[in-house]
């Protein structure tokens, strides 16, 4: 099973954190990431989960469109920056198909650390805006397959 953890792209500043849209820079980041993943065939999923925050929803939507893979978007509770990672980790452990999760820091780093190292703190990963991390599950555990940061795209 493959799991893709993707941090939302760069967003505009604003007073209402939940409503902050992607910036032009962020939109460019997502287009480039989607292009790389499509070109290298490094991404396979039918579903992209995202937090209820606008910047994550927009990142997920642009990613799905750019990948041209027909992935469905699904807003999922438990993916905001301050949410505990145990519930979402348990939910991911029950999955039998690849899924992508578009979320936020420090949540994604804590989630990746919990899945790979068995504990969320201190985080073992740093997810920059519009970075992607692929984890593969085998033999009851998770392992890092690859990581793409915005500087590489």
Predicted regions and their residues:
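Non-DNA-binding regulatory cores of transcription-related proteins
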Residues: 98-100, 105-131
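Domain-level recognition of soluble alpha/beta enzyme cores
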Residues: 119-153
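Generic recognition of short, well-ordered alpha-helical interface segments
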Residues: 55-58, 106, 139
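Active-site-proximal alpha-helix that buttresses catalytic centers in soluble enzyme cores
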Residues: 2-86, 119, 127-130, 153
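Hydrophobic/basic alpha-helical segments enriched in Actinobacteria
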Residues: 43, 47, 67-70, 88, ...
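Mid-chain, well-packed structural core segment of small domains
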Residues: 75-110
